[in-house]
Amino acid sequence: VVKISDSTDSVHIIENGVREFLDNYKDTVYGGGLVAKLGIYCGKIEKLEEVVYPLVSRIVAEYGLGTDTILKFHKGNKQYPMPADSQMQFDILDKSISKIRIVLLVQIGKEGWDCRSLTGIILSQEGDCPKNMVLQTSCRCLRQVVKGMPETALIYLNEFNAEKLNTQLQQQHHISLKEFESGNDKRITLK
């Protein structure tokens, strides 16, 4: 499911995306004990630490989850050092021992990040990822977790990132975002 917000307020987009993810995937556990995860790209460490983390912490508490289900993953700066054990938590995201549900990211995870249990992505503002990487970043959540089983995913975008995604889909796959969204009407079984 691709959701495009007409709001320019990044906080509003993130709040709606997190709530929709938790409403639909909070209790989702895939084969092998992998819990569904949501990735939120934040653009800057300060935004992650000062805006997104407090917002997401409040929302998960409303859903009966603790802050231990949120991973802040960035390389740190002078004001906000890299969170303790975050690299280890990131490395085990796709293992049954990981209980992380929401991953907050800054400039990480766009290349070579293969997390099958990633079920949703939020790109709420321009600059959350490089302009030429919107397709690759937003489609991180489209990997099959259990072979042959029907699965869904959530991609939450602001209008800027939706336009970039549409352009990149047309350039690289010769389809529009509208065709991409309607793809679930023509389901195929992957072998």
Regions found by a protein language model. Give the residues of each.
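Conserved C-terminal RecA-like helicase domain
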Residues: 5-114, 128
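Short secondary-structure junctions
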Residues: 68-69, 177-179
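Conserved RecA-like P-loop NTPase helicase motor core
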Residues: 76-177
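Residues forming the flavin
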Residues: 183
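The feature captures the C-terminal accessory region of ATP-dependent helicases
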Residues: 186-191
